[in-house]
UniProtKB/Swiss-Prot annotation:
Listed cofactors: Mn(2+)
Organism: Arabidopsis thaliana (Mouse-ear cress)
Protein name, entry field: Phosphoenolpyruvate carboxykinase (ATP) 2
Activity modulation comment: Allosterically activated by calcium. It may represent the only case of a monomeric, allosteric enzyme.
Chief location of this protein within or outside the cell: cytoplasm
Entry GO CC: cytoplasm
Length: 670
């Protein structure tokens, strides 16, 4: 996109003369708009089970004991004044009827009686008109005779009150964020995720080896749906969020989330796109509905169930059911999977990537698995943030799917990631962090509850975020790999076939925990850098990406944010400052005109120099003191790449076989 802003992409923008943070001009927008094998699916946020036996033990991990900073009188803790319940605005009968239909029992074919507002509030509120008076039918349960209170699209302040008052383990931190606990599950449960397999999805979806899609039948889904709906209807109150996915106004999706916890409601308030009052008034019937009954287990003896946890997606009914896990990330990633199904039907590519834009309108995509630096590198003081995790690439350009960011917090430091640090304030959800019991200051280094601590905040909490979160077509596609083997160059320029090869491979390397006594790095491959969430075969997404990169003249890059001078344990991690210099050189275009030389085995083109980066690390073998060890390690990694890619060799990519042949030839060459 040209820097004069003449090109429109879902909401015009221009650059004002007033300087923003770090001399970056502000955007002015118009209102609108066990160790897994190589064939297994890589999961970004799986966490081991929390080491506790009771709920009280879990809560005891959350708060660190310390001497109080202010003496307490009479040896008692200072009290907190009570807060009033949430306000109850005038009810929309249409909204209540719509929610009642969402919560209808499939057996009784009637929705619950709904009241808008907090059941603890004394205020009189309107309710859904009851159907004509008749004698109770034989299949009416006690829950069908009561009213269920609906807390619809509450504000963050109201959700804070609900969480602190009714959800044990909810606290306000020293910076104003809401600290919560997700219970026994502190990460996603991919082995408990199910997708309904019917005549349509059997033909369309990716099934079998390497696929994240584990089948279930329609009947079992309906059993779990009924269990979830009955549980939600048995509660005195439920939280309902009506929100959107995708900032592209022509392709946004209406989603409804029905949940039992204020924590879940606030999480989705932050992560989805928040509607205006006018949009909410005319919201109507959602395109997709989530029933989050995570506090209630599924029946593990039900067909296709393997535990008390089940996360079920029915693409035909456009519904998702969550039972037996309170980890909020299941909702976020469940919807991402749905977008991976819906968007390609509209010829729109859904991407697990970060995205930012320079002041001249140049857009970059960042692909990478957990720990590669995707969020860190896409959040750049000198560029506008379009999004940190989920995007769409359409004929109009790129758009963020979400309305918020979900950042890892482990070892978070103000000096290393100031934007994320400063975003943790009022309205932000902090999951499973440990804090001082008196000062409420969070210790981001403490892993007592889990290593997978997270912060969920609205994207506008990032100072340089671009609202609306849309941009022109990308100029650069950056593939990030944290190579713990230490043999990949810090920066490589890729041709189209190489870009597709590494995109389909989705490589990074993990280091086993010290408790296992293993220090060798482990290669991990996740197709399209997000195999845990994709619905179609990876080659379908690769074909779409190749087509769009060709049409827009985008350049592919492979950036190693891992080790240099040796593998993990002998080498050293490439400094973040060097990686930022490399990324800056990509953005500026200087690397396009650099001189390159080609590496052995992988055939990667590496620049002879990058300003601000030591030349000795650009060629990996030069940084290794033991050259023979380097050659052996390089061959080992190349073999792992080839073994992983065997799954895809029989699939055609694109309209003809030429691209497929080029991609196969772009892999390691022994």
């Amino acid at each position: 996109m040209a820097g004069n802003g003449n090109e429109s992409t879902g909401g015009d923008f221009s650059f004002s003369a007033a300087a923003a943070r770090d001399a970056l001009p502000r955007i002015t927008t118009e209102k609108g708009g066990k160790s897994p094998g190589p064939a297994d699916v890589c999961q970004d946020d799986i966490a081991p089970r929390v080491n506790f036996q009771t709920i009280d033990e879990l809560h005891s991990l959350q708060k660190k004991r310390s001497a109080p900073t202010t003496p307490l009188r009479d040896g008692s803790a200072s009290g907190v004044s009570g807060t009033s319940g949430p306000t109850t605005p005038v009810s929309s009968e249409t909204m209540l009827q719509s929610v009642s239909a969402s919560l209808a029992s499939l057996t009784r074919e009637t929705g619950p009686k709904l009241i808008r507002g907090d059941p603890t509030s004394a205020a009189k509120v309107a309710h859904v008109p009851v159907t004509p008076t008749s004698l109770p039918a034989a299949d009416v349960s006690d829950s069908g005779l009561k009213f269920t209170h609906i807390l619809h699209n509450l504000s963050p302040a109201e959700l804070y009150e609900q969480a602190i008052k009714f959800e044990k383990g909810s606290f306000v931190t020293s910076t104003g964020a809401l600290a919560t606990l997700s219970g026994a599950k502190t990460g996603r449960s991919p082995k408990d995720k199910r997708v309904v397999k019917d005549d349509t999805t059997e033909a369309e979806l990716w099934w079998g080896k390497g696929s994240p899609n584990i089948e279930m039948d329609e009947k079992t889904f309906l059993v779990n749906r009924e269990r979830a709906v009955d549980y939600l209807n048995s509660l005195d109150k439920v939280f309902v969020n009506d929100q959107y996915l995708n900032w592209d106004p022509e392709n946004k999706i209406k989603v409804r989330i029905v949940s039992a916890r204020a924590y879940h409601s606030l999480f989705m308030h932050n992560m989805c796109i928040r509607p205006t009052p006018e949009e909410l008034e005319n919201f109507g019937t959602p395109d997709f509905t989530i029933y989050n009954a995570g506090k209630f287990p599924c029946n593990r003896f039900t067909h296709y169930m393997t535990s008390s946890t089940s996360v079920d997606i029915n693409l035909g009914r456009r519904e998702m059911v969550i039972l037996g896990t309170q980890y909020a990330g299941e909702m976020k990633k469940g919807l991402f999977g749905v977008m991976h199904y819906l968007m390609p039907k509209r010829k729109i590519l859904s991407l697990h990537s970060g995205c930012n834009m320079g002041k001249d309108g140049d857009v970059a995509l960042f692909f990478g698995l957990s720990g590669t630096g995707k969020t860190t590198l896409s959040t750049d003081h000198n560029r506008y943030l379009i999004g940190d995790d989920e995007h769409c690439w359409s004929e109009a350009g790129v758009s963020n799917i979400e309305g918020g960011c979900y950042a890892k917090c482990i070892d978070l430091a103000r000096d290393k990631e100031p934007d994320i640090w400063n975003a943790i304030k009022f309205g932000t959800v902090l999951e499973n962090v440990v804090f001082d019991e008196h000062t409420r200051e969070v210790d981001y280094t403490d892993k007592s509850v889990t290593e997978n601590t997270r912060a969920a905040y609205p994207i506008e909490y990032i100072p340089n975020s671009k609202i609306p979160c849309v941009g022109p077509h990308p100029k650069n596609v950056i593939l990030l790999a944290c190579d713990a083997f230490g043999v990949l160059p810090p920066i490589s320029k890729l041709n189209l076939a190489q870009t597709m090869y590494h995109f389909i491979s989705g490589y990074t390397a993990l280091v086993a925990g010290t408790e296992e006594g293993v220090k060798e790095p482990r290669a991990t491959f996740s197709a399209c850098f997000g195999a845990a969430f994709i619905m179609l075969h990876p080659t379908k997404y690769a074909a779409m990406l190749a087509e769009k990169m060709q049409a827009q003249g985008a350049t592919g890059w492979l950036v190693n944010t891992g080790w240099s001078g040796g593998s993990y344990g002998t080498g050293s991690r490439i400094k973040l400052a060097y990686t930022r210099k490399i990324i800056d050189a990509i953005h500026s275009g200087s690397l396009l005109n650099a001189s390159y030389r080609k590496t052995d085995i992988f055939g990667l083109e590496i620049p002879n120099e990058v300003e601000g980066v030591p030349s000795e690390i650009l060629e990996p073998i030069n940084a290794w003191p033991d050259k023979m060890a380097y050659e052996d390690t390089l061959l080992k990694l190349a073999g792992l790449f080839k073994s992983n890619f065997e799954t895809f060799t029989s699939h055609k990519i694109g309209d003809d076989g030429k691209l497929t042949e080029e991609i196969l030839a772009a892999g390691p060459n022994f």
